[in-house]
């Protein structure tokens, strides 16, 4: 599969990203290298090699989702490290603007 500058532009548009010409050239080369590596892997003879789903011989272990209290830490001391706060909450930048979707 050949990766062209148009392919990168298309994916960038779908991702709502904007790249200049230098970045397009760089990403086209990088993605081309990645795809070439994947193509090389598909040429490896795996005849007789048993399929592997998980390389570690153990089941997935989940812990209970229980909040842990950090010794000596309070909500106030943790909030001291927050760059922006509003009404006692952490203030983060807007990611999705509902006005843009309408």
From Swiss-Prot:
Pfam families: GatC. SUPFAM superfamilies: Glu-tRNAGln amidotransferase C subunit. Disulfide bonds: none annotated. It comes from the Bacteria. GO terms for biological process: glutaminyl-tRNAGln biosynthesis via transamidation; regulation of translational fidelity; translation. It is an enzyme of class 6 (ligase). It catalyses: L-glutamyl-tRNA(Gln) + L-glutamine + ATP + H2O = L-glutaminyl-tRNA(Gln) + L-glutamate + ADP + phosphate + H(+); L-aspartyl-tRNA(Asn) + L-glutamine + ATP + H2O = L-asparaginyl-tRNA(Asn) + L-glutamate + ADP + phosphate + 2 H(+). GO terms for molecular function: asparaginyl-tRNA synthase (glutamine-hydrolyzing) activity; ATP binding; glutaminyl-tRNA synthase (glutamine-hydrolyzing) activity. Its EC number is 6.3.5.-. Keywords: ATP-binding, Ligase, Nucleotide-binding, Protein biosynthesis. Allows the formation of correctly charged Asn-tRNA(Asn) or Gln-tRNA(Gln) through the transamidation of misacylated Asp-tRNA(Asn) or Glu-tRNA(Gln) in organisms which lack either or both of asparaginyl-tRNA or glutaminyl-tRNA synthetases. The reaction takes place in the presence of glutamine and ATP through an activated phospho-Asp-tRNA(Asn) or phospho-Glu-tRNA(Gln). Heterotrimer of A, B and C subunits. PANTHER family: GLUTAMYL-TRNA(GLN) AMIDOTRANSFERASE SUBUNIT C, MITOCHONDRIAL. Belongs to the GatC family. This is Aspartyl/glutamyl-tRNA(Asn/Gln) amidotransferase subunit C. The gene is gatC.
């Amino acid at each position: 599969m050949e990766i062209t500058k148009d392919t990168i532009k298309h994916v960038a548009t779908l991702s709502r990203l904007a790249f200049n010409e230098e970045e397009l050239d760089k990403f086209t080369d990088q993605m081309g290298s990645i795809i070439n590596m994947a193509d090389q892997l598909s040429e490896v003879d795996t005849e007789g090699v048993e399929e592997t789903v998980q390389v570690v011989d153990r089941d997935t272990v989940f812990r209970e989702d229980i909040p842990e209290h950090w010794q000596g830490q309070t909500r106030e001391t943790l909030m001291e490290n927050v760059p922006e706060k509003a009404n006692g909450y952490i203030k983060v930048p807007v990611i999705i603007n509902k006005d843009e979707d309408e």
